[in-house]
Amino acid sequence: IVQSYQSWYGVGLFKKDGKNRDFRVVANVRNQTQIVAVLDRSPIRTFSDMKGKVVNLLSKGSGSNVNCENIFKGLGLMDKIKPKFLGFAASGRALGDRQVDVFCSAGAPFTIPALTELSIRKPVRYISMSPAEQKQLTSKFKFYAPKTIPVQKDVRGMKEPALSFSYPVFWYAHKSMSGEAIYEMLKIAAEPSNLKKLANTAGYWKTLNGDFSSLVSYKMLVHP
């Protein structure tokens, strides 16, 4: 939702190009959370501890980069950290090699392969927001909802839940597509046997739904 909001209003990544309202939302595919993690032996325990540290915010232009930057800008820490902009796999390797101190990424919904795989060799910890930090971010960015990431048994080193936020990932279509075409597309995707095949390829498809509540306050449109 973050990139679609920026495109709809011509801000952030889309400031140079201006508003683009030629798309419509057709389905809610899944919810993601935002993960901020460190090596388990790191002295970093809180977001305040990240001042002066090397924090990877993922590749510029990616959706996860926007969400990572929103965290540190929203908490007033962006000018107090040393940002890096490595991709998913490279950032996992960099954390393991201690080239970066902090790893930030989207979770689908609560893990990301690069971090989970690293934890097998070098245990990691998710950094929890304080309740005040969580409220500060979800109040500033209305498209985020408070979410607690439960302990993930596949992530070695994670022993406590972590306060974070969640946000929806939508399926879009051009506004010029006919209602009939959209209906047929969704009908085929949502047919139980087809949905099962999609979910076997990417598990998040099993959560395909019609929850568009997060669009209301920003007056963004669902097809048609």
Where are these regions (language model features)?
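A bilobed periplasmic-binding-protein/Venus flytrap-type ligand-binding module shared by bacterial periplasmic
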Residues: 33-44, 137-142, 157-181
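Short helices/loops that flank or line small-molecule/ion binding pockets
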Residues: 1, 70, 89-103, 116-121
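Ligand-binding "clamshell"
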Residues: 8-25, 113-131, 137-156
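Beta->alpha turn/N-cap motifs
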Residues: 1-13, 87-88, 104-112, 129-131, ...
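Bilobed "Venus flytrap"/periplasmic-binding protein-like clamshell domains
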Residues: 31-97, 196, 213-224
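Acidic, S/T/G-rich, low-cysteine, solvent-exposed domains in lumenal/extracellular/periplasmic regions
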Residues: 149-167, 192-197, 201
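Short, glycine-/small- and polar/acidic-enriched structural segments
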Residues: 1-59, 126
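An extracytoplasmic/periplasmic, membrane-proximal ligand-sensing/linker region
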Residues: 90, 107-126, 136-142, 168, ...
